[in-house]
């Protein structure tokens, strides 16, 4: 077998492969022998069908079967011998496939780029340091109390955190627009669900009042005909309700678990949960900075075929989130996912090189600690640990996550790392 490799463009390669006629003839002969033993033809006993009948009835399909075997087998033999790191699937083009002649074909495929890490010392990472305060716990308790709140009708003016019931009719240039009208609409004030200025226009009014609100739709509003338009809403305020928070009693805290018997227990449980969430958020924030730095310092081309596979993964995930199926996923525009898919492939290749160059292997103790941390969020942590230990797929996922964390640590050891004192809210609600 002879081999000729050429670079077509970027990461695309074309390999011309010649398979000697004796190998082709032997493969065809062996396939005909197998067929002669197994084919059934009316009027002949199994294994006694004449050769010319087999040729006439099955010759074309037998040769196609031989071809389907020879092409990938000799292609992969060739790329393994040449140590080519193939990405995706090859496409084959037959040049010659005739009795008594060499099989000549070409395979077009992509290769993974050669990654040589550089510039790790130029990567800048800001590592937040956070201490959870009693005030942070107080805020979390307030959230829990609001989740259990009741509502009491009020004759006072509407304010933030109230619940109001309204009728409204919206118009632009004196004309009502689609979707701008509602009756008995319940609005939780202060949550920012409506366009800017809408809730603020209700504040200060009482139940029974009718009034107008002037607002402007945001330039990025989803309805094309309303983007940036000035609008007027005629409001009828039908009801104002004040939020009534439950008292922080032992009876209240008992709702949050069998082991929560006092306010002190609740605060301890909240702190534990906040610490776990904070730890995950900090790991994620540092990891994203490392990823951004790696990509910036190591721009690499990625195989289009692998990006396409990742696009399909993202498509299917998006469809599943909204209850769709595979057919619906295929209809989603690839442009929605291309940038994220490309980034994922880049990250995978760069992390693989970090792991390879540092000879990293998943730390068993670190994996155990990660499983224990996950299990601590459940009522029966021992059962969760056992479940993980018996599930190969879950264990592989844990090892991969641990390996990625070790890769991040390896980059951090060479990067420019600075610490910044931050609050719990700054880390957990960065957009607030």
From Swiss-Prot:
Q: Which residues form the PPIase FKBP-type domain?
A: 161-246
Tell me the disulfide pairings in this chain: none
Q: Where are the transmembrane segments?
A: none
Q: Which PROSITE patterns match?
A: FKBP_PPIASE
Q: Which principal EC class is assigned to this enzyme?
A: isomerase
Report the EC code(s) recorded for this entry. Answer: 5.2.1.8
Similarity section: Belongs to the FKBP-type PPIase family. Tig subfamily.
The record describes the protein's role as: Involved in protein export. Acts as a chaperone by maintaining the newly synthesized protein in an open conformation. Functions as a peptidyl-prolyl cis-trans isomerase.
Name of protein: Trigger factor
Gene symbol here is: tig
